[in-house]
Amino acid sequence: MSIRARVEDAEFLWKHERYEGAFLSALSAVAATARLRYPDRKTTKDGDAFRQFLKGGKGGELGVEFRGDVHSIEHIFYKWLRCELVHEGGLPVDIQFMPDASPGALSIRAGGKPEFILKLSHGWFHYLLSLVANAPENRGVFEQ
């Protein structure tokens, strides 16, 4: 299987409203692309490669309050989305997806009482796929 197949799987699952599976496939494509960018497993662990790849996709640092601490968005995607989906088979109960406020918006809602739920807009899914598709490491992979 290839990174392109992971992206196609993600898009198929998303179209059929299987959001967790779609995110898992998208995050798998991110992880595989990150490993292409940072191939030395001795100097760069999987989680570090994943976070560094995501950090390279945007300017600045985005911190989000979650579970009583402020975490980078890259850490949230790695620890509480990628790792939970891979190792536990689902998202934590305190993370949910929400529709975009406007098309393509990257929104995060860190809820306080009574919910204490972190909500991520659908735009994040599309953002992850665009990072993978536009990564120099994947040049030619997505061209028809």
Please identify what each model-predicted range represents:
Residues 1-53, 69-73, 77, 87, ...:
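Amphipathic alpha-helical interface elements
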Residues 55-144:
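Long, charged low-complexity segments
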